[in-house]
Amino acid sequence: MASLIYRQLLTNSYSVDLHDEIEQIGSEKTQNVTVNPGPFAQTRYAPVNWGHGEINDSTTVELILDGPYQPTTFTPPTDYWILINSNTNGVVYESTNNSDFWTAVVAVEPHVNPVDRQYLIFGENKQFNVSNDSDKWKFLEMFRSSSQNEFYNRRTLTSDTRLVGILKYGGRVWTFHGETPRATTDSSNTANLNNISITIHSEFYIIPRSQESKCNEYINNGLPPIQNTRNVVPLSLSSRSIQYKRAQVNEDITISKTSLWKEMQYNGDIIIRFKFGNSIIKPGGLGYKWSEISFKAANYQYNYLRDGEQVTAHTTCSVNGINNFSYNGGYLPTDFSVLRYEVIKENSYVYVDYWDDSKAFRNMVYVRSLAANLNSVKCTGGSYDFSIPVGAWPVMNGGAVSLHFAGVTLSTQFTDFVSLNSLRFRFSLTVDEPSFSILRTRTVNLYGLPAANPNNGNEYYEISGRFSLISLVPTNDDYQTPIMNSVTVRQDLERQLTDLREEFNSLSQEIAMSQLIDLALLPLDMFSMFSGIKSTIHLTKSMATSVMKKFRKSKLATSVSEMTNSLSDAASSASRSVSVRSNISAISNWTNVSDDVSNVTDSVNDVSTQTSTISKKLRLKEMITQTEGMSFDDISAAVLKTKIDKSTQIRKNTLPDIVEEASEKFIPKRSYRILKDDEVMEINTEGKFFAYKIDTLNEVPFDVNKFTELVTNTPVISAIIDFKTLKNLNDNYGITRTEAFNLIKSNPNVLRNFINQNHPIIRNRIEQLILQCRL
């Protein structure tokens, strides 16, 4: 039987070349190395402790009291109080919009009897009668609404702090009036607030309206003491103006430089083009079944102009957080079904790894302050026809998601020939219209983007935006930063393994079942297993050696070793009693079944849990005590042999991993049975259990006590044709007792006869087993 290859891998040993040991150490061993050469040492490594260099702080802190500023004429901003510190009598300020607002404030010193005084206001000599009988200064707000009218005293502020204020806000001009320390604000209407300018004849300050309480405090109580010293020199208002220097759209800026290294900030536009990859697998058979429709990573290379310079870019698009859907139109071989198709929705993410040939990516090893800003894009699915042999074709159509930028990190992007240090842009998803459906089925009005046709005929999807990063690079631009450990032997091996896994999985539909049964009956050994590989005898031996070494560490080998030791210990101390309890104690070495049978039989859930545990270990017993019937491992080894022969990507360094994975992952859903007289007891890895009669295939109660007695001393048989398939076969076609008995025993000759007769139910069952041979 083909499963002999697994037993050989478990028991045989091969000589090991020194070259194999060295190669294994180089690919698997890791070591932490600390390099501490100092910041200026002559080394090809970057300084171990490198700082951020000079940082341009762009944080703006708005002062509460900004000033003092020298007398000037300007248009004050809205939402800011102008606080004027008057130091003499006469005109304090003039303000107008030349349409409906003219105002001037004149200061009158204390103890002034009524008197006519001349004032120069807006270029005109005006005479006002003023007086002040208090100990405080008076500030008279003179107002007119037209250039033809005369000024009149609209409001007065009596103050001992000699401060007045004016504010443009909410379509009105606000000033203070009353007497300090209880002065309050009042306002005047105007239809043209924005054009009001002011000529100030004294020093002044600027206070944001958000700090109006402080302005009120200053008006009523005076300025802080620090503002009243001779060391405070008023500045020109122009010093408050910021000289804006707009950064170039695409610009490289040197931030800091120390000897061998410098920090460069790269700011640039970016155009990201990407496409989704997908894989559609249709198994053999009558042509009504699809086993998988899935997303896979897709590369895309393109050119575009950035600031007049042509850039060559490379992207890799992948998805994470996929949702698995399925459609089952029935259990007959001619019923349309899709075992699994993938859909991305709100809980999914799309990753786009981006690299281009610009300077920013040349030395992308030591990077900080990585940021990006990208727009969103909508991805709409197209149509995919399920071309069934007879009848109207079902069609998967529609579906849409919108991608929204959610972050950026560094990544390593693998191409066919080289690994590139890249930027990984992460996008969150929201579902969008239209919904998707499978026409002529019950699947309608579902939301998300299915993997059947995610690009909808588009060559690519495009996202534009900007990115910025600071990179530590050599001061001499001719030097290349060493890319330490960005590409290792193991990473390259993982890429090869990924490609090989995809190829192996896609080969499932190319396996002819009649040839598979014949191959499963052959006693495959090391050299016949690998004979299909184009190589010399020496290389085949070397491959067998590598596979043997890898297989020794597999879960299967470890489980068999532990089971053998456990049985050996149990045999040396086992009681000769034939009671139920002693039988359960013996079976516990196989199954870990509880000693307390009553606890096991309390509920169906307990039985399900125990039978699931038992079934996973029955494989080991079947492997050690081979029966005449065909086993799941025979099919697994035959499929592995067939795929190795058909593969174009098998390498010496990838074969051991593939064989190990195949032994553990091929056919995860297995059923095993035990025969006693005319009764069959069957359990599977999903925890389901059946007991039935051979003659009628009618179910009978499943007796756990009886099962635990039988499993120790009775051969275990792989249920190649499981109970569900047997019932379907008998109900639709009818089978004799002899045929049923041979199918229950997994007789390979009977299986071959059914397959040669192209029996749809048996073929469908074997197809499902082949489809489970996936990595």
Curated annotation (Swiss-Prot):
<feature type="short sequence motif" description="YGL motif; interaction with ITGA4">
    <location>
        <begin position="447"/>
        <end position="449"/>
    </location>
</feature>
<feature type="region of interest" description="Spike head">
    <location>
        <begin position="65"/>
        <end position="223"/>
    </location>
</feature>
<dbReference type="GO" id="GO:0016020">
    <property type="term" value="C:membrane"/>
</dbReference>
<feature type="region of interest" description="Spike foot">
    <location>
        <begin position="509"/>
        <end position="775"/>
    </location>
</feature>
<feature type="disulfide bond">
    <location>
        <begin position="317"/>
        <end position="379"/>
    </location>
</feature>
<protein>
    <recommendedName>
        <fullName>Outer capsid protein VP4</fullName>
    </recommendedName>
</protein>
<keyword id="KW-0472">Membrane</keyword>
<feature type="site" description="Cleavage">
    <location>
        <begin position="230"/>
        <end position="231"/>
    </location>
</feature>
<dbReference type="Pfam" id="PF00426">
    <property type="entry name" value="VP4_haemagglut"/>
</dbReference>
<dbReference type="GO" id="GO:0020002">
    <property type="term" value="C:host cell plasma membrane"/>
</dbReference>
<keyword id="KW-1038">Host endoplasmic reticulum</keyword>
<keyword id="KW-1160">Virus entry into host cell</keyword>
<feature type="region of interest" description="Spike body and stalk (antigen domain)">
    <location>
        <begin position="247"/>
        <end position="478"/>
    </location>
</feature>
<dbReference type="GO" id="GO:0019062">
    <property type="term" value="P:virion attachment to host cell"/>
</dbReference>
<feature type="short sequence motif" description="DGE motif; interaction with ITGA2/ITGB1 heterodimer">
    <location>
        <begin position="307"/>
        <end position="309"/>
    </location>
</feature>
<keyword id="KW-1162">Viral penetration into host cytoplasm</keyword>
<dbReference type="GO" id="GO:0044172">
    <property type="term" value="C:host cell endoplasmic reticulum-Golgi intermediate compartment"/>
</dbReference>
<dbReference type="Pfam" id="PF17477">
    <property type="entry name" value="Rota_VP4_MID"/>
</dbReference>
<keyword id="KW-0348">Hemagglutinin</keyword>
<keyword id="KW-1152">Outer capsid protein</keyword>
<keyword id="KW-1035">Host cytoplasm</keyword>
<keyword id="KW-1037">Host cytoskeleton</keyword>
<keyword id="KW-1032">Host cell membrane</keyword>
<dbReference type="InterPro" id="IPR035329">
    <property type="entry name" value="VP4_helical"/>
</dbReference>
<feature type="region of interest" description="Hydrophobic; possible role in virus entry into host cell">
    <location>
        <begin position="388"/>
        <end position="408"/>
    </location>
</feature>
<dbReference type="InterPro" id="IPR035330">
    <property type="entry name" value="Rota_VP4_MID"/>
</dbReference>
<dbReference type="InterPro" id="IPR013320">
    <property type="entry name" value="ConA-like_dom_sf"/>
</dbReference>
<keyword id="KW-1043">Host membrane</keyword>
<keyword id="KW-0945">Host-virus interaction</keyword>
<dbReference type="Pfam" id="PF17478">
    <property type="entry name" value="VP4_helical"/>
</dbReference>
<dbReference type="GO" id="GO:0039665">
    <property type="term" value="P:permeabilization of host organelle membrane involved in viral entry into host cell"/>
</dbReference>
<dbReference type="GO" id="GO:0039624">
    <property type="term" value="C:viral outer capsid"/>
</dbReference>
<dbReference type="GO" id="GO:0044163">
    <property type="term" value="C:host cytoskeleton"/>
</dbReference>
<keyword id="KW-0167">Capsid protein</keyword>
<dbReference type="InterPro" id="IPR038017">
    <property type="entry name" value="Rota_VP4_MID_sf"/>
</dbReference>
<dbReference type="GO" id="GO:0044168">
    <property type="term" value="C:host cell rough endoplasmic reticulum"/>
</dbReference>
<dbReference type="InterPro" id="IPR042546">
    <property type="entry name" value="Rota_A_VP4"/>
</dbReference>
<feature type="short sequence motif" description="KID motif; interaction with HSPA8">
    <location>
        <begin position="643"/>
        <end position="645"/>
    </location>
</feature>
<dbReference type="InterPro" id="IPR000416">
    <property type="entry name" value="VP4_concanavalin-like"/>
</dbReference>
<keyword id="KW-1015">Disulfide bond</keyword>
<feature type="coiled-coil region">
    <location>
        <begin position="483"/>
        <end position="510"/>
    </location>
</feature>
<keyword id="KW-0946">Virion</keyword>
